[in-house]
Amino acid sequence: SPENNDTVKINTGALSETYVFNWGKAESGLGSPITYTIVFDKPDGDFSNPIWSKASDNSGSNAMVTLTLGELQEIYNAAGASGVASVKWNVKVENGSPNIKYGQVANSLNWHLVVLALEILH
């Protein structure tokens, strides 16, 4: 979650409140630990140079990340929009091996191309 085309309203008076993103857990065929990084990009981006990223909860080991509304405001600002900003998010999955490509790391890798609208409330 969130679902496609969800709108998150960012209350600038409550920037410490949180919003949770979660996804299906990946498994490494090598038995090595999996780490996750959530990445955000503009709707026309390809995630090669995301506008914002953060390791998931528990130092990257959980299949979820808890972001504050302040962090969502950073993403909103990085999107360079005013009014409602549309962004998409994805999850980068790694197992620590530089020789393993994404498709080989996990047998249940979920790529999220979710469009999310962020709106600032004053």
Give the predicted meaning of each segment.
Residues E71-G83, L113-H122:
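Glycan-association/targeting regions that enable binding to alpha-glucans and other polysaccharides
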Residues S1-L30, P98-H122:
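Pro/Thr/Ser/Gly-rich low-complexity, intrinsically disordered linker/stalk tracts
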Residues W23, I38, W89-V91:
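An aromatic-rich alpha-helical recognition segment common to small helix-rich domains
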Residues T37, N49, S86, N107-N110:
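Extracellular/lumenal ectodomain signal focusing on beta-strand-rich modules
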Residues S59-N77:
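Aromatic sugar-binding surface patches on proteins
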Residues Y76-G103:
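Beta-strand-rich modules
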Residues A14-Y19, A26-D57:
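Solvent-exposed loop/turn segments flanking beta-strands in beta-repeat/beta-sandwich domains
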Residues G24-P33, N77-V84:
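Short, surface-exposed loop and linker segments with low hydrophobicity and enrichment for Pro/Ser/Thr
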